[in-house]
Amino acid sequence: MRVIDYGRLLLLAALWGASFLFMRITTPAFGALNSAFLRVLFAAIALGLLLGVQGKWSGYQGKFTSTLQLGVINSGLPFLMYCLAAQWLPAGYSATLNATAPMMGVLIGALCFAEPLTLRKGGGAILGAIGVAVIARPTSGLSAALLLPGIGACLTATACYGLAGFLTRRWIQQRGGLEAERVALGSQVGATLFLFPFFLWSCWHGPAVDWRQSLPWIAIVMLGVVCTAAGYII
């Protein structure tokens, strides 16, 4: 890879790492369902404005529905899972468990898409799992009642990422491809539509929320615009 590619990877890692800190701010204030919905909503708005300025609203070449469906898997479900995990786990745990996404990709590819499980892939997945287990070992202040559901939510999210990689190849790349900005916008619109009923349910039946808090709003805008919208097009 070129030097600029390494720089983009480091920037993306920083953005995704920061997202877990922002979720630790927004989730206690707004709740998991509301935080997940607002994240994808602000991401969709930011991407919509960007593509509108660039004149790229059209040109999906019959793949818009596919990007909507992809958004449920690569954004809607994972973001909901991470917001749920933020109720139970410190940000460092979620960020570390996020590193299991490549391992999930290897497993899902072998089990569901007939991808050859080579020694290199299998060895990498095993080493990755060992590394995550060592780094994310339980601390004395974290009970199993919090640890297990948090880990389960994070692993569900990374499984979605692993699945999304193969579906992107099948639904987008093998059908002629599509610009990253268009895929990102369609995905965030799809995730917004998916999470909207959960948001409505939370507003009507969930715990009361004080929407006048300024810091959570700043965090949710940063989470949606910077960590999500910018992250998906880097």
Placement of each model-derived feature along the sequence:
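Transmembrane alpha-helical segments that form core, pore/gating elements
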Residues: 47, 105-106, 143-206
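Juxtamembrane helix-entry segments on the extracytoplasmic side of multipass membrane proteins
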Residues: 1-6, 29-33, 37, 59-65, ...
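Hydrophobic transmembrane alpha-helices of multi-pass small-molecule transport proteins
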Residues: 47, 108, 117-139, 195
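Specific transmembrane alpha-helical segments of multi-pass solute transporters/efflux pumps
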Residues: 15-20, 48-98, 134, 224-234
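Alpha-helical transmembrane segments of compact multi-pass small-molecule transporters, enriched
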Residues: 19, 41-46, 97-111, 126, ...
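Cytoplasmic-side transmembrane-helix entry/capping segments in multi-pass membrane proteins
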Residues: 9, 62-72, 117-130, 150-151, ...
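Juxtamembrane helix-loop-helix junctions in multi-pass membrane proteins
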Residues: 14-44, 90, 163-191
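Membrane-interface helix caps of multi-pass small-molecule transporters
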Residues: 25, 49-52, 84, 88, ...
